[in-house]
Amino acid sequence: MRDLVRRIESATPPGRDRAVDALRALAILGVVLGHWLVTALVTDSGTVHGASPLQHMPRLAPASWLLQTLAVFFLVGGQVGAAGYAAARGRGVTYRQWLGARLVRLSRPVTALLMVWAVAAAVMLVAGVGTATVYTLLKLVLSPLWFLLVFAGLTAATPLVTGVHPLWPIAVVLHVDLIRFGLGGPSWLGWINVAAGWLVPYCLGAAWARGGLRDRRTAWTLLLGGAAATAGLVLWAGYPASMVGVPGSRTSNIDPPTLAAVTFGLAQCGAALLLLGPLRRIPARPAARAAVALVNLSAMTAFLWHQTAMMAVTAVGMLTGRALPGLHTVPDGWGWVLARLAWLPVFAAALLVCWAAFHTYEQGRRGRRGHSTVVRTGVLAPQGETHHDHA
């Protein structure tokens, strides 16, 4: 264990802001736990179909306020992207070279996931698994990939958006919601908010990289102002309280993003900035620093494969021939919640198996003289540029 800590420490560049690494680690843990807690695969109808405890227990909506951490991802992504592009320009790296390297790093682990699931889907269909079941599983696996598409687009636009004030995309989201909700406009307009909505925290991250957002007053303004605006939109404007999608709900705050999701993201960004000070004090011990670094090095693998891990456990559980509580049953009560909490360590163990099989696609190929290239994929990996980790 001590040797692992020393290796991770030696691979960590000096001067790194470990608080940013810790923010990213908290964000990825929130996404993984959030999906595991609000996604159920029910087997009560002869097929496998998705369900959510938020359908049956809407009072659990406040849990989504803690587990939906996408704004933090885009905040950190904007900070890392803007700083990385500025550093690349200082070294004489062209925009095409900088962007190409980042997109290649994003695409490598995604390609592995798509290839595995293309084969798995074909095998299931040949084996006679119903198309509805295969569709449910593929939807769970592929739906998180929208995040990477948006992130790749914002990364490509980094030189253009680094100087954009967040109020501009907020104004776009406001007008889109006003037209589609207030004036009965077409629902497809909401997809404009996919870019505009997540551009808000990305722009905040870019401002952070330029030296802004350093004072606590700004952070408190974002937190309190965003929270107050979100509360007002939920209480008096009819927006859903849940910050994650709920099957069967007429309106989703996240698919596509609404004004409530954007104001909630502002509050999250404010909270994240306020946490920077405490987070810089927490990883004072080498073991704690190594744990944060390890989560960051595995962030992309965890993001891409955590749903697969949950589905693998669900499939193995079906071999018992009965519906296991918290795994195959309808999420309609506190009994299901408690049972699902008990399954989390099993999901984590399955994710470790996925990590062992696929983390090399995230960390890159081994080079000469025993070195391995550790990939930095913007928001889903630690700060800085590619460096080499001595094996």
Predicted features and spans:
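Alpha-helical transmembrane segments and their immediate juxtamembrane cytosolic regions
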Residues: R2-A391
